[in-house]
């Protein structure tokens, strides 16, 4: 399937690499600034606390619910629709180890009955602060481990300059996606962490395809200009990149629109991550590899000195 028919023309992607790197640097700096100044809106998974899911017989008035909870000592409550307009999820910060989740849940229900007698408790969940801290550390460790493994694999499978470019693109995607959640104040929980790991996998897959084509052209094409070969490789893989991205984005848009509040953050992270991952696989990974000195001679030398499966 072809979206673009270029008639053998090579697009000069790398002519814009300095502009692209400047744009990426600006986004990364803005993301870091927001993360360090504003911070992340960590969810119950990381902060600990109590989540109470309640149901109404009619669509819930979130503004009224927040007002009633504030009047009854729950001013810090986070209230959002959960699955339907009649179900809401109330998230509360930890209130001391001596206060049981059931007690807090009953207090929330009692307060909400002042606004609507039909309210019923669906579910109550408690996460201790120490558990939340452990999950935060383990989540960060999982992401770091994934990046290290990717660096080792790409360096072994291709060439170390490609590995640096691939990991640079992945770090770029992770930082900017996390920065988006910081800027917008969206809740960051385990589902968002899972989405970011999925974005890493998606972006890596695209980067590997491009890197493989660049390596192949370095060996086959009788051109010594590194930039020209990279442009040629990016052009040859462009249709594949666009088809993969567009089909993925269409599914994610459907998930974002009709998936409900439960997976809204997950869909947001994936949707933005696919956009930024597609961009980074074209501009960031290749630009970093060029900066690190990737060349036809380096790749050909690696190919000649490392035995293939047939030689072994």
Where are the language model's segments positioned?
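Transmembrane alpha-helix detector for multi-pass membrane proteins
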Residues: 193-213, 239, 243-250, 279-286
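Hydrophobic transmembrane alpha-helices and their membrane-interface caps
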Residues: 162-214, 272
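Conserved small/polar residues in nucleotide/adenosyl-binding loops
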Residues: 302-308
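Alpha-helical transmembrane segments of multi-pass inner-membrane proteins
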Residues: 19, 26, 137, 141, ...
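Internal alpha-helical transmembrane segments of multipass membrane proteins
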Residues: 136-176, 180, 246-255
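Structural signature of multi-pass, alpha-helical inner-membrane proteins
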Residues: 1-155, 187
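Hydrophobic, glycine/alanine-rich multi-pass transmembrane helices and their short helix-loop junctions
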Residues: 153-156, 242-290
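Helix-loop junctions and hydrophobic alpha-helical segments within the transmembrane domains
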Residues: 221-241
